[in-house]
């Protein structure tokens, strides 16, 4: 009986020691998810690109930058957001769910907004979008991220903006062949 009690005490001791790193990792993951959610709320939903420096390191890298942007540094990120907010002044991001592992947070997001301003050399369409995406924020240390990857349903967005026909629409007629002057003299 003494041996059984001793074995149980030792086993419980090992079990509690083993759970401490996991608890610390869970706390870190929870803190990182909260920080990314704050970024979405305070930068994107508040349309406030000036808050970027509070959430990103100076050497931040966006691995999927918008056209015309390098994806390097917070100044480039702020410029990208300013252009995006001008094109979609009512843009809103909803976080559907988040998963954290180590220094990374993966978010399934939905972005809505109306294209009422130009974006680069593309004129405003006046049409609304409602698209899903995956956003991965990484290198989170001391509450600041150093990199990001993002994917969204670009085909759905282009269809909603009128830049592509909807799925199942008849194909466009073939282009007329170029006419050339065969009687060159």
Which residue ranges define each predicted feature?
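C-terminal motif of bacterial Sec signal peptides marking the signal peptidase cleavage site
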Residues: 14-16
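C-terminal and inter-domain tail/linker signature
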Residues: 18-185
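Positively charged n-region of N-terminal signal peptides that target proteins for export
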Residues: 1-4
């Amino acid at each position: 009986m003494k041996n059984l009690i001793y074995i149980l005490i030792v086993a419980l001791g090992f079990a509690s020691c083993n759970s401490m790193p996991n608890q610390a990792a869970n706390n870190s993951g929870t803190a990182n998810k909260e920080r990314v959610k704050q970024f979405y709320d305070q930068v994107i939903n508040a349309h406030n690109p000036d808050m970027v420096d509070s959430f990103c390191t100076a050497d931040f890298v966006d691995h999927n930058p918008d056209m015309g942007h390098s994806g390097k540094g917070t100044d480039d990120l702020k410029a990208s957001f300013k252009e995006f907010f001008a094109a979609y002044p009512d843009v809103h991001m909803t976080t559907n769910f988040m998963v954290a592992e180590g220094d990374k947070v993966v978010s399934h997001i939905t972005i809505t907004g109306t294209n009422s301003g130009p974006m680069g050399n593309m004129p405003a369409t006046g049409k609304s979008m409602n698209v899903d995406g995956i956003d991965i924020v990484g290198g989170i240390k001391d509450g600041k991220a150093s990199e990001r990857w993002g994917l969204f349903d670009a085909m759905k967005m282009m269809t909603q903006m009128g830049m592509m026909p909807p799925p199942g629409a008849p194909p466009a007629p073939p282009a007329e062949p170029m006419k050339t002057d065969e009687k060159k003299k």
